[in-house]
Amino acid sequence: IIFKEKYDEAISKNQKNIEAIVISSYSVLSNEVNSRYVNLKMINNNNFTFFSNYNSPKSKEFIEHSQITALIFWNSTNTQIRIKAKIQKTSTQYNDNYFSERSHKKNALAISSQQSEKIDSYTSVIKNYNKSLDAGNLKECPDFWGGYSFIPYYFEFWEGNESRLNKRDSYQINKDRWDHSILQP
């Protein structure tokens, strides 16, 4: 409920890129934490969903270690939201339905991109993209693309102000209820 209130407030203040969320994951192989922005596509019953290439480095990290941290900052309201959760793939049917509703251009990019792989030049990206556009059949979801969802078990809401007496509230799931704590700035 608190997240929805903060989200609605940011929308009312015309927050740009409101769907941008940082996802941090852990690589067992390199013993490093990696962070990147993704586009949050859906929030439904506290279930957050975004889509990606299943062959990407982040996808491999999700398999190695399903614990993630997510971070959102909305400058229009000076609000930061930190989230902890376990991540999992969405179903093939869910992916197929979502993919079939997307634009041809977005699907061509999803099909043509080998996300995060090294390339010789940006020209090759454009060439592969145009090749996918020309090939057609852009409503069939490839096996290597799909969604990830997570249901938070921890939220921290940070509200900044000029005095630096920032307001911080945390919510931790405890069985079937949320325990609330006020945190020092």
Describe the residue ranges of each PLM region.
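Binding-site signature for planar aromatic cofactors or substrates
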Residues: 1-185
